[in-house]
């Protein structure tokens, strides 16, 4: 019995430390230093939660920028079903999906003459990505401008305004948050696109 006492004391100490003190401390520090991020990076407009800056949404109307395809099967951008498609690059099913997406994008963007950006045809690893490269957003500008009856230059300026650049070039590439950009388009016109 004497040999079990140190083991039990150590177990109880570690249980309290890792199951109580550490989680409470990290939660408190997160709330103190990074409250917006610790609470889900929620985007508020008109006193309502419109989305998260971390999770994409399904925008299908012509007046909105479209994000990457969602890999969640039943409901696009369902965070409960997060995960990649798990299809290998050599899988014919992936090739068929990409070809179908390219055809749909070409039909929806007849003004675009350049190649369809890769990230508009392939899902991200999580299937919930909300960011595009500035090039992929720029590829959609003519469609969005025409649908909203806005000058192309004004929409391009909005894309440039919502392009997030890393602190240093070796820390990543510039990205455009599609949720924020589409909400800014709505705010610009004071309504939602049809």
Swiss-Prot record:
GO MF annotations, alphabetized: ATP binding; P-type potassium transmembrane transporter activity
Cited Pfam families: KdpC
Membrane-spanning ranges: 12-34
UniProt-annotated location(s): Cell inner membrane
GO cellular component, one term: plasma membrane
Keyword Cell membrane: yes
InterPro entries on file: KdpC
Main location: membrane
Keywords: ATP-binding, Cell inner membrane, Cell membrane, Ion transport, Membrane, Nucleotide-binding, Potassium, Potassium transport, Transmembrane, Transmembrane helix, Transport
Membrane topology reported for the UniProt record: Single-pass membrane protein
Cited function: Part of the high-affinity ATP-driven potassium transport (or Kdp) system, which catalyzes the hydrolysis of ATP coupled with the electrogenic transport of potassium into the cytoplasm. This subunit acts as a catalytic chaperone that increases the ATP-binding affinity of the ATP-hydrolyzing subunit KdpB by the formation of a transient KdpB/KdpC/ATP ternary complex.
Family: Belongs to the KdpC family.
PANTHER family: POTASSIUM-TRANSPORTING ATPASE C CHAIN, POTASSIUM-TRANSPORTING ATPASE KDPC SUBUNIT
Summary of subunit composition and partner proteins: The system is composed of three essential subunits: KdpA, KdpB and KdpC.
Name of the protein this chain belongs to: Potassium-transporting ATPase KdpC subunit
């Amino acid at each position: 019995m004497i040999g079990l006492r140190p083991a039990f004391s150590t177990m109880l100490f570690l249980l309290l430390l890792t199951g109580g003190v550490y989680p409470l401390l990290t939660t408190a520090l997160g709330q103190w230093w990074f409250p917006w991020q610790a609470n889900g990076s929620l985007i508020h407009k008109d006193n309502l939660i419109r989305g998260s800056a971390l999770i994409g949404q399904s925008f299908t109307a012509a007046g909105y920028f479209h994000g990457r395809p969602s890999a969640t099967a039943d409901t696009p951008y369902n965070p409960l079903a997060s995960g990649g498609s798990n299809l290998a690059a050599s899988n014919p099913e992936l090739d068929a999906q990409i070809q179908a997406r390219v055809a749909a994008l070409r039909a929806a963007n007849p003004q675009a003459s350049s190649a369809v950006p890769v990230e508009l045809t392939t899902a991200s690893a999580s299937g919930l990505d909300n960011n595009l490269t500035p090039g992929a957003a720029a590829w959609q500008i003519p469609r969005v401008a025409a649908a909203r009856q806005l000058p192309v230059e004004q929409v391009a300026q909005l894309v440039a305004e919502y392009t997030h650049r890393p602190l240093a070039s070796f820390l990543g590439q510039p990205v455009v948050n599609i949720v924020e950009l589409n909400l800014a388009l709505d705010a610009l016109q004071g309504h939602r696109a049809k």
